[in-house]
Amino acid sequence: MKIKNQQSPARGDIKTRLFNMKRILYTLAIALSILACSDEIDKSNRYTFTGETMADFLLNRSEKYSHMITLLKRAELFSLLNTYGQFTLFLPDNEAVEKYIQEQDSIYSTTKDTEAPIYTGITSPFVEELSDSMANVIARMHLIEKNYHTAEFGEGAIGKWNFNDRTLVVSYKVVDERFYIMLNNSAAIIDSDNEVENGIVHVIDKVIDPEYKTVANKISEFRFFSLFHSAIAETGFSNAVSEKFCRDSESFKEELQNYWKLNPNRYIKFTAFVEPDKVFNENGIYSLDDLKAFAEKWYGTEAKGNYKDPKNALYKFVAYHFVEGEIPYNRIVLSKSGTGPDFDKYYVAGHDLYNYYPTMQGTLMKAMRPLSTTDGRNIYLNYSKRALPYNIEMRRHINVRVIELTEFTQMDEKYTDFMPNAGNGLIHPIDKILIYNENEMVGNIINERMRFDFASLQPELSSNNLWQNTYGEFPAEYFKGIKKMGGNGLIMYIPGAGYLLDNIWLYVDFDFSFKLPPVPPRTYEIRISQQAHNHINTGRTMASYQLYLDNKICGNPLLQEPHSDDLDIGWIEDNVTYDNGVELDKQMRNRGWMKAPDSYNDYYGGFVNARQSFSYLRKIIAREYLSDGEHWLRFRYLGAPTVEGYRLFILPIDYIEIVPLHIVSDPVKPEDRH
């Protein structure tokens, strides 16, 4: 079948309809979770259970799916589908497979950028004559090693990669009053949730294309991105985002203890935020020359005419649109579809959700879902709640909305076939021209307490589908933003708890430096998260460690998990104080400590608010002027006693706060508790 859009509705209609779609999906998800937790399951309300394995499902319908059987066998995956496990198969029928093969250009696929042709492996229109490599790729594009019912989908990426190490992006379409779930805005699910012994089968109407073009070259495919593509071509920026993977993880095997599975390749991926031509046109920009003049207005004329120089205005303009790491829409900031059913228990309603990303310009971008406003369903870049920006000319360039794929494909007929997936990342359309202006950032957008999740600052995690998803254990060399200074320490990534639902653990005799994000030059108070205990709940003696900022010692050594009720910290529950903890906050600050934020709840503590939990603190480590250039925070293990033969040396680190000094000391508007 062929899915087409109906006539494009107004934005308000689109948003309302999408909201209703998602509400139905979330209601189904809740119902499923209730059934799963019940001791007595009403079988009449379950999905039809066939008693077949996934392999049986295919063989029993071989007249429709023989091509996929052939492809799965050639990829040496078919026997896997006869085993115990959890799999999701997106299943195109024979007609869809044949059509896909016939639609491929030739043996070679080229791009508009005249890059080296890509071998497709397709030498004839017959499935049996596909190359081994192409058969393998097609089969792997359609299989995921986890069960996914459609009720678990939300706008954005499916949590786990497919067997081809690619993200599948979910969106929606309505055709003739029928609702369709789309994969990569290409394949529609036409028969969903066929449950088998070892997984779920969703029948789709097309083969999911194994896209290999880079992000930059994928942008060039869409005429409605022609101006931004011209800027990429002029600056040669495609070279900066051309990597697909770097050092093979096989070379790390001697250094890893292999407690948890590590992705066999260390991919390098990128995310691009791109304006359609219509957005440029609305700002009087119709040509590349117009865009060059616009860039020089905001970024100056240094290296004028040398467009491949990183100091050139056009180069800076392009670079600010890219961040390292593959960041799906539903993980730009945390969302229920990106994190799972515990989201509503974990985050306190009404608090804004945000994250900060270092861009390839070497500056910051802030992403935010303003849940404290009536506009909390959207994600914005460089969001401001001020009625007017710090610089009045910036009014067109702040509160830049990232447009969901479903909405974007229905905004204009030209956008109908837009696919966000590239071979090395993702593309997100935006609704305003995105620029970096330091005066606006310092005076408005990031004139605030900035809280950076240590894990989200490591793009290797999102590039390899580990971020908020998979346990992993690594040497420091896996990350370019972490340096090993000495010792034999390892780094463990732990999803599921913490400020942004994850933590990094340092263990053994660790000595690591973490690169700090590129904040504007000014004086800051710097704090880190600190896990703790109290005397009632533990008698353990903990390891100690020393912090250094740019090789300068930060105060006295710290315990791995100090006792929060010690006199030198002084934590007490707010509800036993006469003023709900106001004076206590001042006393703790004088001792160099703060309670945890009140905007999220403690996952391990039964979802008690983090501020009311003795297990979470913030340690004030320095007040320093951070100049332009790199800055590094070092964690150095000092030693641990042996308790019953076990050395205690795990240090969980969650986030770092970098706070402009005037925010800390403002007597008129004290810093909030969020």
What is each of the regions a protein language model found here?
Residues M1-L35:
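Sec-dependent bacterial lipoprotein signal peptides
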Residues F57-L91, E95:
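Post-signal-peptide N-terminal segment of Sec-exported extracytoplasmic proteins
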Residues Q102, I107-A187, K292-E413:
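Aromatic/histidine-rich interaction motifs
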Residues A240-L256:
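Extended compositionally biased segments used for macromolecular assembly or nucleic-acid engagement
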